Amino acid sequence: VEQDEPPAGHARDEGLRALGVQRTRQRILTAARHHLIAVGYRSLSLEQVATDAEVTRVTIYRQFGSKLGLLDAVAEDLAQRAGVVAGMHAAAALDDPVAAFRAMVSETCRFWNTDPDLFRRLVSLSAVDPEAHRVISSREQWRVGQVAEFVARLAEADRLRSPFGPDDAGVTVAATTSFTTCDDIATRLLIDHDRLDNLLLPMLNGVVRLGRH
């Protein structure tokens, strides 16, 4: 038996409802980001976040489950805003391992430039709060894993410099391109993070061969 399709008005109402939920979620994330940077995680008041987002605390708990869930969503929103996953996939799709590695470094620097203030707070928070560390370290481990894959391609192409093996080179490249390292350089030189690839790549050429054989 064929079922009647829902009326057009019903579908439109559902679409508007979903759009409203998404806008509410974004207001909460924006407010949470602001207060997280200003006061840190421990002093983060869900009541204040709710007030700024023009919702109730119940709405926050309904959407994010807990304060830690809200932190996780803020971190995920940062990655979504930056488009870092798509950027890394685009770099990995390059056939030349050297070009792919260069693109990965540039993408990483662009990622750090998305929201340096929030990155600083997340990194410092990860160092002192065990719960937050679990949320944030999983994302950093993803980045480190991505770096290892790009380095492995260079190793297969005989592009590692002595005395580096794949593991040594991967750890060194990951540390050199970490937010902490990049932020220190950018802050001292008063330049944007997305300009750091021009400095990092010559440094990393001491680990991997990025020029012609």
Name every feature range the model reports, one short phrase each:
Residues 1-55, 62-69:
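Basic, helix-initiating cap at the start of DNA-binding domains
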Residues 21, 25, 75, 105, ...:
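Amphipathic, non-transmembrane alpha-helical scaffold segments
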Residues 36, 71-78:
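Alpha-helical DNA-contacting segments of helix-turn-helix folds
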Residues 46, 75-82:
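Short, basic, alpha-helical segments at the C-terminal edge of helix-turn-helix-like DNA-binding modules
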Residues 64, 124-129, 179:
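Short helix-capping/turn signature of helix-turn-helix
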Residues 73, 86-114, 170:
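Hydrophobic alpha-helical connector segments
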Residues 110-123, 131-157, 167-171, 202-209:
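Amphipathic alpha-helical packing segments from all-alpha helical-bundle domains
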Residues 155-203, 211-213:
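Hydrophobic/aromatic-rich alpha-helical bundle segments in the mid-to-C-terminal region
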